[in-house]
Amino acid sequence: MRDDGTPSDMLYDRVSVSAEVYAALGDTPLLMSGDHTGDYNEVGVMKSLAVQMGVPSEDVFLDHEGYSTYESLYRAKAVFGAKRMIIITQEYHLHRALHIARELGMEAVGVSADLRPYRGQTRYNAREHLARFKDFFAAAKGEYDGHLDPPVDLNGDGNET
C-alpha cells in the first residue's frame, strides 16, 4: 500500500485477480489478510477495492493481523477455520505461501496475480529468499506466538470482521 492510502500495483492486482476468481466461482468468501497497524489499514483498502470490483461486502472477511505470510496462513486456519483455499499473490511469493499452507495441513492451490512488471522486483526477490528460509522453519514447527482472535465463521457476514 502506498503512503497516501492507495493500493500499490501489486496489491491492486492481487485484489483484481481475487475479484475475478470470486466472479468465476460464485458464492465463495474472500479472506483478505494484511497489516492494520494504526493508520495503516491494508486490509481495509483491499476490501474497499474488492467491493468496488463487484464483490459483495459480506463475502469479504478481514484478518487485520496478517503481518507475514506465515501469520496470515496460520490465522486463516486457526481463526477462520480454513481447510481449503486458493492463494492469490504474485508468482515470486506463491511457492512459499503454498508450502506454508500445506505444512499447516491445508489444501491449497495458487493463482498468480502478476498482471504487469513491478517496480522494485529485484528487491522483492531478494527479500523472498530470506523469508523462505525463515518460514521454512516456522512452518515445520507449526507454532504461532501472536494473538489469536475468537473463531470466525467464513459462512457468516464478512462485515463483522
Language-model region placement:
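A structural signal for short, hydrophobic/glycine-enriched beta-strand patches
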Residues: M1-A126
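A general structural signal for short secondary-structure boundary/capping elements
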Residues: T37-N41, V109, A131-A138, L154-N159
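A transmembrane-helix-recognition feature enriched in membrane-embedded lipid enzymes
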Residues: N125-H147
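Short linear elements at protein peripheries
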Residues: E143-T161
